[in-house]
Design a protein with these regions (language model features):
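Active-site beta->alpha N-cap acidic-glycine motif
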Residues: 3, 8-159, 165-189, 194, ...
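Short secondary-structure capping/turn micro-motifs that flank functional sites
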Residues: 90-91, 150-151, 198, 227-228, ...
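Short strand-loop junctions, especially beta-strand C-caps/beta-turns
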Residues: 48-50, 86, 195-197, 270-274, ...
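Sec-exported extracytoplasmic/periplasmic mature domains
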Residues: 75-79, 135-136, 175, 179-186, ...
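Catalytic domains of cell-wall/extracellular-matrix polysaccharide-remodeling enzymes
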Residues: 119, 123-127, 133, 146-293, ...
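N-terminal propeptides
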Residues: 309-428
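Extracytoplasmic/secreted envelope proteins and their assembly/folding machinery
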Residues: 67-71, 82-83, 127-131, 171-174, ...
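Solvent-exposed, acidic/flexible segments
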Residues: 59-67, 120-127, 163-174, 200-204, ...
Length: 428
């Protein structure tokens, strides 16, 4: 039942608050993007787990595939989406269906999209027409994993699930879909979301390491569009209506309380069945888009949203904005929570991430993890900078910056991140 999933999520939050130390964010090449800073009424929508080549459920759209219904609805409102697609789950066997209404409804050991034993109706491999329609109509496609296998253990809800054995397997899985999109469609993927948001992996690696290797940003979300959890109503019509209401009413209340609530936010949706094999998104998406339109919002892809501002705490009104955008394209200057924290003092580890070439910083950290199973987020960059005399060999990553290489910076007396980035001499 859906209450198990809800209980698991609540339990995880409690454990995080009471037992687990607060997550430490660090400067890296990949950051988790949940929302961006903007005063404009612009937001993004993402659609996970498709494309789906089966009809909506219940089918009231003359047999159209669910993905076609979603694309029709987006077109009706002039909206664009980011479709977080999978490749193909037909390799995810042997397996069996779990209990309807549970997290394992579509498979005990693996996920199957759009449903178990219907894998040939789901994913990019089997839905060339839908992928081409997404691209032709200006939507974005992102990488949700070729086989949609979780990156590591997730005991609260998916304790029986198979997971990828480590870093290399995750890179290989993502590369299969990445290669297909490039070779078949000439399309370059730039964003990804890990299956079920599982980040920790075997060997001390995380999804951030994988995405850095792939050249991706981590596409998260700040608002749950809902619909994926089933209603407990026994009557199917009442259940569907409850699920539609669960998608629309929280959005309505948020807008009534604060018309600017969704500025810069990323809204999560599902391109597939919920746990009861219904698709309330087919019926609720239009209502959500109508609400957003009523309040003057433009609904865009995550990529377009990031063109407004790629950062959570710095917008276009900041005098350093353009330089920061340019720097972030080639250097690690943003924390993993997508914040710049410009007014804080910079540490030596953060300086090393600014100075070290991307490939050196990433490859050295990966090599250390392979060798020892442990590596700090700045160890690769620190190693390079020490070898090349860019930082003092005796300094530690957590030490405050007290001096800068003269050839690379204008004069700085107060070593905040803002001042250091402003003083950095950009490469011609």
């Amino acid at each position: 039942m859906s209450w198990i999933v809800k209980l698991g999520k609540k339990g995880k939050k409690i454990v995080k608050k009471i037992i687990t130390p607060a997550e430490k964010h660090y400067v890296g090449y990949t950051r988790r993007i949940e929302r961006v800073k903007t005063g404009e009424r612009i937001c993004a929508m993402t659609f996970d787990d498709g494309p789906m080549g089966l009809p909506a459920s219940p089918d009231r759209f003359e047999g159209k595939t669910l993905t076609d219904v979603l694309l029709d609805t987006l077109a009706q409102y002039g909206a664009k989406g980011s479709f977080d697609v999978i490749g193909d789950t037909s390799e995810n066997y042997p397996d069996e269906a779990g209990k309807l209404g549970s997290a394992a409804w579509g498979g005990v050991k693996f996920d199957h999209y759009p449903d178990i034993h219907c894998d040939d109706k789901g994913g990019a491999v089997h839905n060339d027409r839908l992928i081409r329609r997404m691209l032709d109509e200006g939507h974005q496609i992102t990488n949700h994993g070729y086989r949609h296998i979780i990156f590591g253990k997730k005991p609260f809800v998916y304790g029986a699930r198979e997971y990828l054995p480590g870093f290399d397997a995750a890179v290989a899985d993502l590369t299969r879909l990445d290669t297909q999109m490039r070779e078949r469609y000439g399309y370059t993927l730039t964003l990804a979301r890990p299956p079920h948001y599982v980040d920790k992996m075997a060997g001390g690696f995380t999804s951030y390491d994988v995405y850095e290797r792939m050249g991706y940003q981590y596409m998260a979300a700040s608002f749950d569009g809902a619909g994926w959890l089933p209603s407990t109503h026994e009557d199917p019509e009442a259940a569907l209506q409850a699920e539609i209401d669960a998608m629309v009413e929280p959005m309505r209340k948020a807008l009534e309380k604060d018309p600017d609530f969704f500025c810069g936010q990323i809204i999560f949706q599902k391109d597939g069945y919920n746990m009861a094999k219904r698709t309330p998104v087919a019926f609720a998406l239009g209502k959500q888009l109508a609400l957003l339109k009523e309040y003057g919002y433009r609904v865009v892809s995550v990529g377009e949203l990031m063109e407004e501002s790629p950062f959570t705490d710095v917008g276009r009104d900041d005098p350093l904005f353009e330089k920061l955008v340019a720097l972030a394209k080639t250097r690690a200057i943003v924390f993993t929570d997508n914040k710049l924290r410009l007014d804080d003092k910079m540490t030596v580890g953060e300086l090393a991430m600014l100075l070290a070439p991307r490939d050196e910083a990433i490859s050295r950290r990966v090599a250390q993890l392979r060798k020892t199973g442990k590596a700090g987020p700045y160890d690769g960059a620190m190693s390079y900078c020490r070898e090349n005399g860019l930082i003092d060999a005796s300094t530690k990553a957590e030490d405050a910056v007290t001096r800068l290489p003269d050839a690379m910076f204008d004069k700085v007396t107060d070593f905040t991140r803002r001042n250091i980035y402003a003083a950095y001499k950009m490469e011609e």
